[in-house]
Design a protein with these regions (language model features):
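Extracytoplasmic loops and strand-loop junctions of Gram-negative outer membrane beta-barrel proteins
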Residues: 82, 130-134
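Outer-membrane beta-barrel "beta-signal"
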Residues: 141-154
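Outer-membrane beta-barrel and related beta-rich outer-membrane complex signature
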Residues: 23, 57, 122-130
Length: 154
């Protein structure tokens, strides 16, 4: 992790073995991310790859997010693209999210969010809304979620 003033950057690489039956397989994960805070707005992006052992299962993802200050609150937006390389018709999805958060005090805020994952015909990527995962019923479904809430940090 690197942080200097308004600039942040991160990189990671993991390689680990997991036991499957009697054979140990090796999985790899890697990613890069960066962000910049311009004061009234901020932008961040990342690129991630997960390559589990075996053929035709490499997962890649791109993420771009923005935050814009609106008075004391903040409007947030995010776009994520995901793909699994299967050697056939690759499952793909684009997820869009928008949120607004408004502080009520130093430790309490209210928020509203909307998100949608758009899967291609073979995609079955889920949508995560807060701590809930909304999975598509069948490949090609497009899960959606809207939430409002009050958050207090202890």
């Amino acid at each position: 992790t690197y942080a200097a003033g308004p600039l942040t950057a991160q990189a990671y690489y993991h390689q680990f073995k997991r036991a499957v039956g009697t054979d140990a397989v090796s999985d790899k994960q890697m990613g890069l991310g960066a962000g910049y805070n311009f004061g009234m707005f901020r932008i961040a992006g990342s690129y991630n790859v997960a390559d589990p052992d075996g053929a035709n299962n490499k997962h890649t993802g791109y993420n771009l997010g923005v935050g814009v200050k609106l008075g004391a609150g903040e409007l947030l937006g995010q776009v994520i693209q995901q793909k699994v390389s299967t050697g056939g018709t690759d499952p793909k999805a684009t997820t869009f999210g928008i949120a607004y958060t408004q502080p009520l005090s130093k430790r309490t805020n209210v928020y509203a969010t909307y998100g949608q994952t758009r899967n291609n015909s073979t995609g079955a990527f889920s949508l995560r809304a807060s701590d809930i995962t909304i999975a598509p019923v069948v490949a090609g479904d497009d899960p959606k979620a809207f939430s409002v809430g009050l958050r207090h940090m202890f």
